[in-house]
């Protein structure tokens, strides 16, 4: 709009200047054609061979005078002659209002713009005659100037409208193209909203397409952030599903493990009621009840320990002599399994680390019990302790039949079994290795297993330092 206004002003000044130049020539010719000595009224006494009849000054009929020209002769403030040239070249009279308008500008010597009565806008100029008494007023129509300006405004208007329509259309297209990735991001979010995330196994395959997740653009950064959020949610949902699955399996296995000794207790109790007069049979039944009760007690204690470890409750912290602990555990294992061969491989100096002595003793005891239960008589079980720059490594190695490859990834699961039967070897709760894994993890350590026929190794890595003494927790 500013450019249009500036162009209009410049063009109008140029056209008016051209008209003023033409007006100056017309005024000059009119002054030349006006006699120096002309009797004042009546005007009709003036004679020239080119004069035609009609109102107005006769110099309107001079050669070169343009059509539409107005002219007046003002003498002593009174218009003595006034008229204009029609399109056919004849003279016509001005209205009285038009004559008065020309009289009023007789004293001016610069071009002026007048809206002449009955004729329209004119550019007029007053000039003294050669006799020095009269004033010659001439004027040229501004119709061409106004028509040119109107045409220019129409052209500018059309061009402006076309430009606005084109700019608007281009803007809409550009905005739609720019917002298309954002719409796809919103579509992805809407698809996620429609997924049933509150139940069952949840899969979250929906992602923002890779081209819309380019971090080089703002929309791409949004898409990338949404993908990362969806990845995090998917991982959390998968973890939740895995946890729920483990809990369900754990509850099912725990129920089975408790159901078996409870059924035995109930059966032996009913048996004692039927054979009350047989002291030997009653004694045997009561011993079995006591055995199954002890089994339930161990199972419940193991479950409570795992629950405490799962909840992240801190263990007791203090210096633990791993060498002494290994010696004691192997001695106990030798008493429990005299048909096995037990060996120790310890460094010359005691190995002391920070930790919970009772739980670390349980780690070694459970590993040795696992080797004793799952290997045959005569198996050599070696307990080896070594130190590194930052860790202590405890290894329990046996030359038994080994662990099936399919089971090695599950040996630290709760109630893991090497076969499909629901039987459990005497004295085993099925939680020993699960407790080992949980205790080692609570000490910021790791445990691994490697096995093949004739060789099985459990390796526990525990940090040498980095533990801060904590208050003991309720056990």
Curated annotation (Swiss-Prot):
Cofactor: a divalent metal cation
Domain HAMP: 176-238
Quaternary organization: Homodimer.
Entry keywords, A to Z: ATP-binding, Cell membrane, Kinase, Membrane, Nucleotide-binding, Phosphoprotein, Transferase, Transmembrane, Transmembrane helix, Two-component regulatory system
Reactions performed catalytically: ATP + protein L-histidine = ADP + protein N-phospho-L-histidine
Cellular-component GO terms for this entry: cytosol; plasma membrane
Topological domains, Cytoplasmic: 175-475
Name of the protein described by the UniProt record: Probable sensor histidine kinase TcrY
Modifications after synthesis and translation: Autophosphorylated.
GO molecular function, one term: ATP binding
Biological process terms in GO annotation: phosphorelay signal transduction system
Protein's membrane topology: Single-pass membrane protein
Superkingdom, taxonomy of origin: Bacteria
UniProt topological domain (Extracellular) ranges: 1-153
Chain's role: Member of the two-component regulatory system TcrY/TcrX. Activates TcrX by phosphorylation.
Transmembrane segments annotated in the record for this chain: 154-174
Effect of gene knockout: Cells lacking TcrX and TcrY show an increase in virulence in mouse model of infection, with significantly shorter survival times.
EC numbers: 2.7.13.3
Species assigned in the record: Mycobacterium tuberculosis (strain ATCC 25618 / H37Rv)
Cell compartment(s), UniProt: Cell membrane
Domain Histidine kinase: 253-466
Residues recorded with modification Phosphohistidine: 256
Metal-binding as UniProt keyword: no
């Amino acid at each position: 709009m500013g450019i249009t206004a500036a162009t209009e002003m410049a063009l109008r000044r140029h056209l008016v200047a051209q008209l003023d130049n033409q007006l100056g020539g017309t005024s000059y010719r009119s002054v030349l054609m006006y006699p120096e000595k002309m009797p004042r009224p009546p005007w009709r006494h003036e004679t020239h061979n080119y004069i035609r009849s009609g109102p107005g000054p006769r110099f309107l009929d001079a050669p070169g005078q343009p059509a539409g020209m107005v002219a007046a002769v003002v003498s002593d403030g009174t218009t003595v002659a006034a008229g204009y040239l029609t399109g056919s070249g004849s003279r016509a009279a001005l209205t009285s209002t038009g004559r008065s308008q020309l009289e009023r500008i007789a004293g001016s010597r610069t071009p002026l713009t007048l809206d002449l009565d009955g004729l329209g806008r004119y550019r007029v100029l007053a000039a003294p005659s050669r006799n020095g008494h009269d004033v010659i007023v001439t004027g040229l129509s501004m119709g061409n100037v106004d028509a040119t300006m109107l045409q220019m405004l129409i052209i500018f208007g059309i061009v402006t409208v076309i430009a606005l329509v084109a700019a608007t259309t281009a803007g809409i297209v550009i905005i739609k193209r720019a917002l298309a990735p954002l719409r796809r991001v919103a579509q992805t979010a809407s698809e996620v909203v429609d997924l049933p995330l509150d139940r069952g196994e949840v899969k979250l395959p929906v992602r923002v397409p890779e081209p819309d997740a380019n971090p080089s653009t703002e929309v791409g950064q949004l898409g990338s952030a949404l993908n990362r959020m969806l990845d995090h949610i998917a991982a959390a949902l998968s973890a939740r599903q895995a946890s729920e699955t483990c809990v369900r399996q754990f509850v099912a296995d725990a129920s089975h493990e408790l159901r078996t000794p409870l059924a035995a207790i109930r059966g032996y109790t009913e048996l004692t009621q039927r054979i009350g007069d047989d002291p030997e049979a009653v004694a045997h039944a009561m011993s079995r009840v006591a055995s199954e009760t002890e089994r339930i007690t161990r199972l419940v204690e193991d479950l409570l320990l795992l629950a405490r470890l799962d909840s992240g409750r801190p263990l007791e912290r203090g210096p633990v002599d791993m060498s002494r602990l290994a010696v004691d555990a192997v001695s106990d294992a030798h008493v429990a399994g005299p048909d096995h061969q037990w060996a120790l491989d310890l460094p010359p100096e005691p190995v002391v680390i920070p930790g919970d002595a009772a739980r670390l003793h349980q780690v070694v005891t459970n590993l040795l019990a696992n080797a004793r239960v799952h290997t045959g008589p005569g198996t050599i079980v070696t307990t080896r302790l070594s130190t590194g720059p930052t860790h202590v490594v405890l290894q329990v190695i046996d030359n038994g039949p080994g662990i099936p490859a399919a089971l090695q990834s599950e040996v630290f699961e709760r109630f893991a079994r090497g076969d499909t039967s629901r039987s459990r070897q005497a004295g085993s709760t099925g939680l020993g290795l699960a407790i080992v894994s949980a205790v080692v993890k609570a000490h910021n350590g790791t445990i691994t297993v490697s096995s093949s026929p004739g060789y099985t190794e459990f390796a526990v890595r525990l940090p040498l330092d980095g533990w801060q003494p904590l208050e003991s927790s309720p056990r």
